[in-house]
């Protein structure tokens, strides 16, 4: 075998082993004020340099719109380009705001072109819209959602919009709570996407035994059911986390020790194997502290986290429901951006698990829905606020990005821009983060779902891998040894 062939093989395997890891970022600060480029840059730089956790070089956004404007591109984009942070872009699909989101998307492509395309992992069309559209979401006044067939049409509209542009190969997806993915009435969305975004928070599954002792099993079961419903579509972990402070949800106690344990038992097995965006880096600022608060750095933006983020080899291989290394983003173009991740645990975690979770649950029974209620984002400069969705059971989140939309809050209020979670709901879904304060309710926040969009032939889409697992190194070394032996 020729050297070039061996290296190509090694590179392809390395690409398939790469996984993106990062945090969710809303368009507003915890106090409700708008974020600008310098704010995003500070957050991205902090995430990349967290003590004990190198490689968090990806950012999930909920909207394409800069807070305080009608449809200007969000300033997180130039910040990401400057910081070499990969992006899971999001368009807020609820509240009749898609036209403005598409305008902002087109403007971003025109303005940033290849610099943007090299960093885009995927594009999420909507965030927890199905949850807010569900019987359960309506019961808790989670905010305006979107019918699955309308959402599927939005996904195709985005696919058409990026065709022939530098983002033409970006995989498209949708982010929602796991119980809505297993609801058969939402199958049209699964058919339309390239990947499925999973939001899940055992903390909010307050109709079940949901202590920290139960968290890992609840999470793995939810992932397994989502994977079963998704069929051959990849499942990306777009929101999960455990609060460092706040009220108790049934048996779930918010505390730093419990947040650390959830990170170890759920996060570490994911980080080098599955595209994962944690909730969250920071959701508190000074006196503005949401209840519950999920931020791992507390109320001051610092590289020193509230608990040890290092992952031991043992806890990087402990989760049985973790998906195998992602290939959707790699297929779309791979390892372009900054592969900075550490190769800490190879971990397999195939996560087969059955959990077919037939298609009928709307989520009330299992308490897995409602992430949308925990986050809130204040209003953003313009007339409306966008809300992000959240999937956990908690109901207190809303965030708004400030265009002309209103944002609902989780089981209670869902906002879209920044991930602050206030909980008052009884489900377990995934929280979304868009706005800053956990109190505003709106229905427009941007969400992220990305899929492996059919590679449209005009441009090359390159993603930015953030971590490469140990097997890749072995493959490369083996290839070199074979060359030497030959």
Swiss-Prot record:
InterPro entries, sorted: Beta-glucan_modifiers, Glyco_hydro_17, Glycoside_hydrolase_SF
Active site: residue positions: 128 (proton donor), 239 (nucleophile)
Chain positions carrying an annotated carbohydrate: 84, 183, 315, 386, 396, 404
Subcellular location: Cell membrane; Secreted, Cell wall
Biological processes per GO annotation: cell wall organization; polysaccharide catabolic process
Membrane topology category: Lipid-anchor; GPI-anchor
Keyword tRNA processing tagged: no
Residue ranges the record assigns to the propeptide: 464-486
UniProt-listed Enzyme Commission number(s): 3.2.1.39
Domain of life of the native organism: Eukaryota
Enzyme class: hydrolase
CC per GO annotation: cell surface; extracellular region; fungal-type cell wall; plasma membrane; side of membrane
Signal peptide as annotated in the record: 1-18
Keyword rRNA processing: no
Ranges annotated as biased composition (Polar residues): 430-442
Lipid attachment residues per UniProt (GPI-anchor amidated glycine): 463
Gene Ontology terms for molecular function: glucan endo-1,3-beta-D-glucosidase activity
PTM comment text: The GPI-anchor is attached to the protein in the endoplasmic reticulum and serves to target the protein to the cell surface. There, the glucosamine-inositol phospholipid moiety is cleaved off and the GPI-modified mannoprotein is covalently attached via its lipidless GPI glycan remnant to the 1,6-beta-glucan of the outer cell wall layer.
Region Disordered, residue ranges: 330-458
Compositional bias per record (Low complexity), positions renumbered to this chain: 341-404, 413-424, 445-458
Keywords: Carbohydrate metabolism, Cell membrane, Cell wall, Cell wall biogenesis/degradation, Glycoprotein, GPI-anchor, Hydrolase, Lipoprotein, Membrane, Polysaccharide degradation, Secreted, Signal
Catalytic reaction list: Hydrolysis of (1->3)-beta-D-glucosidic linkages in (1->3)-beta-D-glucans
Function: Glucanases play a role in cell expansion during growth, in cell-cell fusion during mating, and in spore release during sporulation. This enzyme may be involved in beta-glucan degradation and also function biosynthetically as a transglycosylase.
Listed PANTHER family: GLUCAN 1,3-BETA-GLUCOSIDASE (PTHR16631), GLUCAN ENDO-1,3-BETA-GLUCOSIDASE EGLC-RELATED (PTHR16631:SF13)
Protein name listed in UniProt: Probable glucan endo-1,3-beta-glucosidase eglC
Species of provenance: Aspergillus terreus (strain NIH 2624 / FGSC A1156)
């Amino acid at each position: 075998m020729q050297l070039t062939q061996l290296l190509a093989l090694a590179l392809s395997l390395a690409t398939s082993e790469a996984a993106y890891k990062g945090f969710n970022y809303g368009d507003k600060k915890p106090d409700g004020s708008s974020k600008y480029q310098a704010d995003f840059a500070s957050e991205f730089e902090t995430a990349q340099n967290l003590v004990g956790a190198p490689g968090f070089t990806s950012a999930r956004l909920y909207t394409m719109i800069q807070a305080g404007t009608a449809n200007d591109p969000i300033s997180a984009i130039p910040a990401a380009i400057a910081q070499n942070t990969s992006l899971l872009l999001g368009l807020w699909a609820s509240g009749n705001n898609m036209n403005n989101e598409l305008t902002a998307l087109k403007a971003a492509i025109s303005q940033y072109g290849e610099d943007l395309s090299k960093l885009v992992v995927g594009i999420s069309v909507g965030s927890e819209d199905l949850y807010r559209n569900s019987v359960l979401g309506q019961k808790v006044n989670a905010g305006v959602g979107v019918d699955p067939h309308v959402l599927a049409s939005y996904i195709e509209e985005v696919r058409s919009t990026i065709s022939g542009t530098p983002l033409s190969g970006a995989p498209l997806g949708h982010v929602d709570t796991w119980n809505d993915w297993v609801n058969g009435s939402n199958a049209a969305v699964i058919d339309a996407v390239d990947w499925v975004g999973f939001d899940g928070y055992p903390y909010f599954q307050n109709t079940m035994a949901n202590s920290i002792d139960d968290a890992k099993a609840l999470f793995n079961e939810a992932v397994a059911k989502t994977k079963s419903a998704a069929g051959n579509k990849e499942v990306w972990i777009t929101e999960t986390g455990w609060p460092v402070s706040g009220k108790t949800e049934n048996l779930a106690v918010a505390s730093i020790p419990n947040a650390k344990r959830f990170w170890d038992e759920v996060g570490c097995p994911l980080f080098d194997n599955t595209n994962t965006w944690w909730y969250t880096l920071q959701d508190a600022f000074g006196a503005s502290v949401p209840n519950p608060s999920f931020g791992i750095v507390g109320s001051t933006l610092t590289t020193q986290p509230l608990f040890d983020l290092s992952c031991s080899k043992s806890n990087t291989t402990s989760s049985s429901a973790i998906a195998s290394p992602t290939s959707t983003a790699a297929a779309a173009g791979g390892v372009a951006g900054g592969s900075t991740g550490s190769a800490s645990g190879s971990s397999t975690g195939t996560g087969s698990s059955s959990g077919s979770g037939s298609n009928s649950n709307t989520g009330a029974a299992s308490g897995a829905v409602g992430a949308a209620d925990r986050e809130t984002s204040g209003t953003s400069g313009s007339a409306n606020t966008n809300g992000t969705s959240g999937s956990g059971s908690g109901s207190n989140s809303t965030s708004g990005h400030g265009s002309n939309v209103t944002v609902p809050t989780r089981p209670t209020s869902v906002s879209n821009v920044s991930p602050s979670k206030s909980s008052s709901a009884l489900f377990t879904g995934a929280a979304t983060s868009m706005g800053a304060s956990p109190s505003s309710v709106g229905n427009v926040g941007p969400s992220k779902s990305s899929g492996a969009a059919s590679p449209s032939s005009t441009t090359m889409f390159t993603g930015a891998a953030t971590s490469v697992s140990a097997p890749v190194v072995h493959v490369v070394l083996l290839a070199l040894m074979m060359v030497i032996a030959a």
